[in-house]
Amino acid sequence: MELYLDTANVAEVERLAHIFPIAGVTTNPSIIAASKESIWEVLPRLQKAIGDEGILFAQTMSRDAQGMVEEAKRLRDAIPGIVVKIPVTSEGLAAIKILKKEGITTLGTAVYSAAQGLLAALAGAKYVAPYVNRVDAQGGDGIRTVQELQALLEMHAPESMVLAASFKTPRQALDCLLAGCESITLPLDVAQQMLNTPAVESAIEKFEHDWNAAFGTTHL
């Protein structure tokens, strides 16, 4: 199972990389834009924050296949080993096929259906990213989409894997993992919610109170 952070906040990645067992960082154009930094400046800093073994994802902006391929090569040249996110449109599928031949690893993004995700995998995407909460927001069932996509990949494209995205709650993320999802990417607030449970702090304070009452210290 692989856990990613969905952010371009370098300081938070540096902090959380010491806490969470993260495999890397995912970004998208909106996340990069919110950082107010050039993508060519922030990507190297993110890679440094996650280390050489961490996997970094960044997305193309062009709408046509040739433009996507050219931008993917620029990203690869800037960050060797980067995974390039390609929207799963007709042009995107064409780009994924070309990039597969070029040896550039891709993720099929903006996936709203299992069929769409399967096409990305068959075209050559190593990762496929269904948008869990956004599917829910459109009246669909995000977790069901993940389940169906996971089953399809296991049967027809076992070299590809689901990297579920677009979460608003830890429960959504856990349900994806229970559905057999191999990897997820979490926004910072959801990652923090997984750890910051008020009951935990109350339990620790009770332990300290009882220990201090008996031994006059809060240390061993």
Swiss-Prot record:
Function text: Catalyzes the reversible formation of fructose 6-phosphate from dihydroxyacetone and D-glyceraldehyde 3-phosphate via an aldolization reaction.
NCBIfam families: fsa_talC_mipB, PRK12653.1
Lineage of the species this protein comes from: Bacteria, Pseudomonadati, Pseudomonadota, Gammaproteobacteria, Enterobacterales
EC number(s) on file: 4.1.2.-
Entry keyword Lyase: yes
Gene name of the record: fsaB
Protein name per the record: Fructose-6-phosphate aldolase 2
Single Gene Ontology MF annotation: fructose 6-phosphate aldolase activity
Assigned keywords, A-Z: Carbohydrate metabolism, Cytoplasm, Lyase, Schiff base
GO cellular component: cytoplasm
Family annotation (PANTHER family): FRUCTOSE-6-PHOSPHATE ALDOLASE 1-RELATED, TRANSALDOLASE
